[in-house]
UniProtKB/Swiss-Prot annotation:
Source superkingdom: Eukaryota
Keyword Signal: yes
Entries under InterPro entries matching the protein: Defensin-like_dom
Name recorded for this polypeptide: Defensin-like protein 49
Disulfide bond entries: 40-82, 44-68, 54-80, 58-81
Classification via Pfam families: Defensin (PF24552)
C-alpha cells in the first residue's frame, strides 16, 4: 500500500507542476506563420472592418486565411492581408 500511495502522490505532483507551468515557455521554439504582403487589400478600421471581415473576404477570394497586419513598419496603416 505504501508504494501505491507514493506513486499516486508523485503522479499528482507531476500533474500539478505541468498544469501550473507557463505555456509560453513550453512553446518558445514554435515558429510563427509567415506570409507575404503581396495580397493586402482592404484597410482595417477598428469597429468597422476587422479580423472577422478580413477573414471572410480572404476566404471568398480563395485564400485560406486573412489577418489585419501592418505591411512593413508599425507606423504603416493596418491592411487586410490574405495568405494560404
Amino acid at each position: 500500500m505504501g508504494i501505491t500511495k507514493s506513486l499516486m502522490i508523485f503522479f499528482h505532483i507531476v500533474l500539478l507542476a505541468v498544469s501550473l507551468s507557463n505555456n509560453i515557455i513550453l512553446t518558445s521554439g514554435a515558429e510563427t506563420t509567415k506570409f507575404s504582403y503581396d495580397h493586402c487589400f482592404h484597410l482595417c478600421v477598428e469597429g468597422e472592418y476587422g479580423s472577422r471581415e478580413c477573414f471572410v473576404d480572404c476566404t471568398q477570394k480563395g485564400f485560406w486565411h486573412g489577418v489585419c497586419a501592418n505591411k512593413t513598419t508599425a507606423k504603416d496603416p493596418i491592411h487586410c492581408c490574405c495568405y494560404n
